[in-house]
Design a protein with these regions (language model features):
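Short, conserved helix/loop micro-motifs enriched in His/Cys and acidic residues
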Residues: 248-265, 301, 492-494
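A post-motif C-terminal structural segment
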Residues: 20-75, 82-85, 96-107, 123-124, ...
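A short, compositionally biased domain-edge/stem linker segment
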Residues: 107-121
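Sec-dependent signal peptide recognition
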Residues: 2-8
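Hydrophobic h-region of N-terminal signal peptides that target proteins for export
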Residues: 10-18
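Glycine-rich anion/phosphate-binding loops
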Residues: 267-273
């Protein structure tokens, strides 16, 4: 081959490779250089990773099976003229007060607690299946990030947009779009997990939403007080007017309808238990379940069913989820979920050494070993030992998808419950992170670390889509119906790491799970008897500066 032609071929191959991993290169350069012309996290465009936590941004809501479904089920029951933020009385019901600068007579947004009201209204209206899908940490900007990459074009600058299945799917004309405030009741509440008590009801930093500072829409540009949405003062120091939310309080708002303090798991401001929807519908004969790509009793899946004053009491939260005696239900355990599938496998710690920080929130009854599920509890719930759960867990040499679906089939045929326990112990128990181009080779992030996975990590774990399919198999055996929470938790983990590459991959992984849900509805149900809500619990603080730069 002539030298010139060989060089051209090599250049062409290199260009294809670069295009195929464009986001990895973009992310790697951003971390190396400390800035990127394409995007940044925080208030300073010249500091790519200025902020690595949550924000108080308004969050998009996508509903399916709701348009024209009647008062309380139709999303418009809570938007625009019906917004709680236009009414002092409604704000007092939500916050027990009218927070500073939170009344907004022009508000188009609803409150996060309205999603619980919508779910309850759906069951009251006779719906058989209600599914709440939470893309943890996925604000409007994160969705747009993935949509631009997927579409290979800048296709919108406001509104619902296109580029993912949950944006494009119409559910036979029954889909709706809106957005909500996710402000917490307060931050700074101190708790005692051993006594399950709140030490300072009301905390130290009351919540609310100031539209003049936060914006009227999820896509609003920054205000003059750019620090407001991150809970900081106007100069970036100290406490701002309102705190940003965490994943516990925000999940609880959607599962119970009660706004509470950051770190709460289905308890009110004073630590008193509040019933999540799952308890109510389970008592009425429905099946209930939770699925997540992160550990099984992380904040969002914990809020599907458990009750605890602190989100970090992981082992006790898992006990609630599985119907075992816990610190919050020691005398009368909860019934437990019918299906629980998620991560946490292999994530272990003791009370000594470097691992102590992983156990601090768990109280005196922490059992050294797996942080999320003790060996004794795992054995107790297994049908092999007289328990109620068919257990599928990561097993050396076994295909994770196949073992989980086989266990789901056994659970259906034997009328048993299902526990799926997977993950990577060296990666805090989560499933492998997919990246923008669909491989599993994450780029470096805020922590200046790169996760790497073995072939066993990839084959021995199912995907979130696989987990969702297994959950639907088991829950569908209850002919009365079911309630299900599905969490794409890795979106939040990617955004905490200021990682564009894994953020897109996480959104798309979750989107594939949503595709499983819509396929199931079309094949086994319809949009007259099923309601699905897709949303996030909270956002982060990503800004896309040059959207065209995301296109390979």
């Amino acid at each position: 081959m002539p030298t010139r032609l060989l060089c051209l071929c090599l250049l062409s191959i290199t260009a294809v490779a670069d295009a195929a991993d464009h986001l990895r290169d973009l992310q790697t350069a951003a971390i190396k250089n400390g800035q990127s012309p394409v995007a940044h996290w925080g208030v300073d465009p010249k500091n790519y990773k200025e902020w690595g936590s949550h924000s108080n941004r308004l969050i998009p809501v996508y509903t399916f099976g709701t348009l024209g479904a009647g008062e309380g089920v139709d999303l418009n029951s809570y938007l625009g003229k019906n917004s709680a933020y236009r009414s002092e009385a409604k704000l007092k019901t939500i916050y027990s007060r009218v927070p500073s600068n939170t009344l907004n007579l022009a508000a188009e947004y609803c409150d996060q607690t309205d999603l619980a009201a919508l779910q309850r209204a759906a069951f009251k209206a006779g719906k058989k299946h209600v599914i709440l899908m939470v893309f943890d940490g996925m604000d409007w900007q994160t969705t747009r990030l993935a949509a631009i990459y997927n579409e290979r074009r800048v296709c919108y600058s406001e509104g619902r947009g296109t580029g993912t299945h949950f944006q494009n799917y119409t559910a036979n004309g029954t889909t709706q779009f809106g957005f909500m405030s996710v402000a917490p009741l307060n931050d700074g509440t101190d708790c005692d997990v051993d006594t399950q008590t709140v030490k300072n009801p009301g905390g130290k930093h009351p919540g609310g939403y100031n539209v003049a500072k936060g914006g009227a829409f999820p896509w609003s540009p920054p205000s003059d007080d750019i620090y407001y949405l991150t809970g900081r003062g106007p100069d970036g120091k100290g406490k701002g007017e309102h705190p940003y939310p965490d994943s516990a309080n925000t999940a609880q708002a959607m599962t119970s309808g009660v706004k509470s303090y950051n770190n709460s798991i289905n308890v009110d401001y004073a630590g008193q238990h509040v019933p999540p929807i799952s308890h109510e519908v389970q008592a009425a004969g429905f099946a209930v379940g939770a699925v997540t790509s992160v550990p099984i009793s992380h904040a969002t899946p914990a809020c599907s069913y458990a009750q605890n004053v602190d989100r970090d009491d992981y082992q006790d939260l898992t006990r609630d989820l599985l119907g075992l005696p816990s610190s919050s239900h020691s005398m009368k355990p909860l019934q437990g979920l019918d299906v629980l599938i998620g991560g946490g496998f292999g994530d272990t710690a003791t009370k000594t050494g470097d691992a102590e920080k992983k156990t601090q929130g768990q109280g005196k009854n922490f059992v050294p070993g797996n942080i999320w599920l003790t060996a004794a509890d795992r054995n107790t719930i297994d049908v092999a030992n007289g328990g109620r759960y068919v257990v599928a867990e990561r097993t050396a040499g076994a295909n994770g998808r196949e073992s989980l679906l086989a266990a789901a089939d056994r659970a259906v045929s034997s009328s048993q419950r299902l526990l799926g326990f997977f993950g990577i112990g060296t990666a805090k128990g989560h499933l492998p992170f997919a990246t923008a181009d669909g491989d599993f080779q994450p780029a470096v992030g805020r922590a200046n670390k790169i996760e790497s996975y073995t072939s066993a990590d990839l084959t021995e774990n199912p995907t979130l889509a696989d987990m969702t399919a297994a959950a639907l198999m088991v829950l569908d055996k209850n002919k009365k119906g079911f309630w299900l929470l599905v969490e794409a938790g890795d979106v939040d983990w990617a955004n905490h790491d200021n990682n564009l590459d894994t953020s897109i991959g996480a959104v798309n992984s979750g989107d594939r799970a949503f595709q499983v849900i819509t396929d199931w509805v079309e094949q086994h149900s319809d949009w007259n008897e099923t309601v699905v809500i897709v949303t996030a619990d909270h956002g982060h603080f990503l800004w896309i500066d040059l959207p065209e730069g995301l296109i390979p």
